[in-house]
Amino acid sequence: MNSIVIGSGFGGIAAALRLKAKGHQVKLIEKHPDLGGRARVFKKNGFIFDGGPTVITAPYLINELFELFKKDPKNYIELSPLKIWYQFIFEDKSKFNYSGDEANMVKQIEDISKDDVEGYQKLVSFTKKIFDKGFTELADVPFDKPFVMMQQLPALLKLKSYKSVYSLVSSFIKNEKLRRMLSMHPLLVGGNPFTTTSIYGLILYLEKKWGIHYSMGGTGNIIKGLEKLMLEEGID
């Protein structure tokens, strides 16, 4: 079977490789001279800049594309786990090193607001419930019929999907610094924490499950590695 994939972002490349792994002859069409979509790079004054995403939160999804062809991802890309995920600098010049070290997270939260430690732990537990539903259960479900989505409404309402991420966080956290910090995740996907549905709170737990990784040499190097794989496997 012949298949055409339009667009060479991560989604297009992944679709092309998965189709190829199922035995399709695949042609990938891209309007730009280089691949990557939002993950394209641009060069200026001798420097290379990632044009889009830099945070890798579910590295297994990328590794899986190489493993489909029994290839070792380490021969194509290098993903390095980060110890400090984000550093927040507030108006008063105080800093918060956000990481996967829960003991250190609790200590820093305690330094800012002792009363919010329990709320933080409850927030993490609640975002796990969102993650279990929105990612583990539904990430691979095609919502191609209205009824399929309607079936999920009771569960989504129970998870307070009608709230914004900021509103959800605020129901657990009282300190404004911590509220802003813990509700920032929609920014990673171009969303507004004050208007984006709280379902995106699952990112908070997703990070804790797999950590945050950085592609050595930039996100563009992942695209290079995937391009090499596509050429090896005969994708045009």
Predicted features along the sequence, with ranges:
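Active-site-adjacent bridging/hinge elements
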Residues: 31-32, 197-201
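Active-site phosphate/pyrophosphate- and oxyanion-stabilizing loops and adjacent acidic/basic residues
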Residues: 63, 167, 224
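Alpha-helix capping and helix-loop boundary segments enriched in small/acidic/polar residues
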Residues: 53, 194, 213-217
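N-terminal glycine-rich phosphate/pyrophosphate-binding loop and immediately adjacent elements
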Residues: 1-129
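Conserved structured core elements
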Residues: 13, 99, 159, 163, ...
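Helical element adjacent to the flavin cofactor pocket in flavoenzyme catalytic cores
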Residues: 202-236
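Conserved hydrophobic/aromatic pocket- or pore-lining residues that grip, position, or stack substrates
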Residues: 2, 169, 226
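Rossmann-like flavin
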Residues: 91-196
